[in-house]
């Protein structure tokens, strides 16, 4: 299955998602925002999430596949003051996604569309059997 990839996600967030509860995550890294910009929420919309950095993402890396429940991209204006006379105004883009755990996954192939393009992956859902 081919889907967008979110990289550099905290292992604690991935652990919480594996517990089965939907979570809302705020993304501020540009490459992750670009990766989810074209993702439409729905039961057939999946994203691969991993704690591996984008530069190190290769076939064989492990992560999780999640279902996208909601997305929003917004711009925040920030003003910083220094010494009472100087101030700097900046804008910061961020994205919020609500996701729910689907399955553990392994990367089969990585598709990179340049520095400012989205990163997507071909993933295989992992099967786990327990002897009883």
List the model feature ranges, each with a label.
Residues 67-72:
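Conserved hydrophobic positions within beta-strands
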Residues 11, 53-55, 73-74:
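Short, solvent-exposed loop/turn segments at secondary-structure junctions
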Residues 35-57:
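Short coil-to-beta transition motif at edge beta-strands of beta-rich domains
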Residues 1-42, 132:
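Compositionally biased, charged N-terminal/linker segments
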Residues 60-65, 77-132:
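Contiguous surface segments at macromolecular interaction interfaces
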Residues 16-17, 36-38, 57-60, 80-81:
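Short histidine-centered beta-strand/loop micro-motifs
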Residues 1-3, 57-64:
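Aromatic-rich, lipid-facing transmembrane alpha helices and their immediate juxtamembrane interface loops
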Residues 1, 74-75:
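Structural alpha-beta junctions
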């Amino acid at each position: 299955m081919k889907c967008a990839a979110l990289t550099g996600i905290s292992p604690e967030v991935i652990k919480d998602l594996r517990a089965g509860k939907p979570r809302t995550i705020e993304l501020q890294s540009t490459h992750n925002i670009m990766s989810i910009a074209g993702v439409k929420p729905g039961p057939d919309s999946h994203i691969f999430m991993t704690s591996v950095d984008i530069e190190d993402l290769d076939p064989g890396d492990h992560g999780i596949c999640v279902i996208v429940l909601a997305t929003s991209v917004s711009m925040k204006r920030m003003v910083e003051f220094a010494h009472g006379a100087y101030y700097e105004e900046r804008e910061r883009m961020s994205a919020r996604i609500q996701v729910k755990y689907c399955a553990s996954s392994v990367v089969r192939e990585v598709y990179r569309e340049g520095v400012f393009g989205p990163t997507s992956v071909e993933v295989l859902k992992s099967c786990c059997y327990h002897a009883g």
